[in-house]
């Protein structure tokens, strides 16, 4: 009996090798592009699932400046557009119409190692009343409370823009000092700790970056220590002046040049499904008869296992107010038969080949192999949180690039 079994396997293997050399008709390789308007129930289900994949428990509702971008999202847009072309081929690349903030080489290096980047807007709206000695000091505060627990900051920068001072001599210099606020008092000025001082030329123009990595980690681990920053500017003669006189742009300056903070994070892989979505899986399955699946739109003519096109539009989901980029991405999906013989283009595993042969002899007990992704790629999503901070996050295994029989 054993010899007959192996003889049959040998015969089927020979037939498989002969069939694998055949070439598909080119029409079979044409993508099946699915695009239709979602029904309300489908839309809600898709919104829940995608929010779960993005690691969000609700839809962010940021407070925006009449649709205008300030410096923080523009900087993040530049980071987003600096992603690899391989990754961006699966998404709609966002082209900014504004003058952007030009990330430094150091920022791009941080981006390469980071899984998430967050920018933070300055929360100070009105200058507090300071003593005459510090009347020209300016303060900045950033809310780091929304950072997920357990995520470490690998790099952080305070960025402030300096314009050319035309009314001053080109050789004139200013001393810019950045301080950490370490203590507050009701009856006197705050206690300051000098982080860095830098000599600036009057004719100098561009973004100034200050490393606050250690300080940011302190703020995350000990929120009570997050009392913000202060800056001061002195002339070469030692006189304290308004930072604006040295060309430093404050919160009343152009939106695209306002100061902000950016932090780079190394995070663990996002859980594909949260407890919420697992708990509702049974309910979703009970309602499945009322929702047409992708297979329903592609089951009339079953073809061999291959990749099919599927585009997810964030705009169609009504998320264009909080997702900056991309407008959508080509998620794609795998569908088709893994029937004998398995052609070479099916990317079948050795196990799938054997399973197919055994299925032919015992179809009741051994199922056919499944058509599943063999290559998945990441995408990056740029979005606002509830505090109008901008987050750039990489999400793994979001795009199907190849399919095969498993």
Task: Kindly label every feature range from the protein language model.
Residues 2-406:
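Secreted, disulfide-rich extracellular signaling modules
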């Amino acid at each position: 009996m054993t010899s007959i079994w192996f003889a049959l396997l040998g015969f089927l293997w020979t037939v498989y090798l002969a069939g694998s050399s055949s070439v598909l008709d080119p029409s079979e390789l044409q993508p099946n592009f699915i695009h239709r308007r979602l029904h309300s129930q489908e839309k809600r289900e898709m919104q829940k699932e995608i929010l779960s994949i993005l690691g969000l428990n609700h839809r962010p509702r940021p407070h925006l400046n009449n649709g205008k971008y300030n410096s923080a999202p523009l900087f993040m847009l530049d980071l987003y557009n600096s992603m690899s072309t391989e990754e961006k081929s699966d998404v709609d690349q966002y082209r900014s119409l504004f003058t952007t903030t030009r990330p430094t080489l150091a920022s791009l290096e941080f981006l390469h190692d980071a899984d998430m980047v967050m920018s933070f807007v300055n929360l100070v709206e009105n200058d507090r009343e300071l003593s005459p000695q510090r009347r020209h000091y300016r303060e900045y505060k950033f809310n780091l409370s929304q950072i997920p627990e357990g995520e470490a900051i690998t790099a952080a920068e305070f960025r402030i823009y300096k314009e050319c001072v035309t009314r001053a001599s080109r050789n004139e210099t200013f001393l810019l000092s950045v301080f950490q606020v370490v203590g507050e008092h009701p009856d006197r000025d705050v206690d300051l700790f000098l982080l860095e001082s830098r000599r600036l030329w009057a004719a100098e123009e561009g973004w100034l970056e200050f490393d606050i990595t250690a300080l940011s980690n302190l703020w995350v681990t000990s929120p009570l220590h997050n009392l913000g920053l202060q800056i001061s500017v002195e002339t070469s003669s030692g006189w304290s002046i308004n930072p604006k006189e040295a060309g430093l742009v404050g919160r009343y300056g152009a939106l695209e040049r306002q100061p902000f903070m950016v932090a780079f994070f190394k995070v663990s892989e996002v859980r594909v499904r949260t407890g919420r979505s697992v708990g509702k899986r049974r309910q979703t399955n009970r309602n499945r008869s009322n929702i047409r699946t992708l297979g329903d739109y592609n089951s009339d003519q079953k073809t061999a296992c291959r990749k099919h096109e599927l585009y997810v539009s964030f705009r169609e989901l009504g998320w264009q107010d909080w997702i900056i980029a991309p407008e959508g991405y080509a998620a794609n999906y795998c569908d088709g038969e893994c029937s004998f013989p398995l052609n070479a283009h099916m990317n079948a595993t050795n196990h799938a080949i054997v399973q197919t042969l055994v299925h032919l002899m015992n179809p009741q007990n051994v199922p056919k192999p499944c058509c599943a992704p063999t290559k998945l790629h990441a995408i990056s999503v740029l979005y606002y949180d509830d505090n109008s901070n901008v987050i750039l996050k990489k999400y793994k295994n979001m795009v199907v690039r190849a399919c095969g029989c498993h």
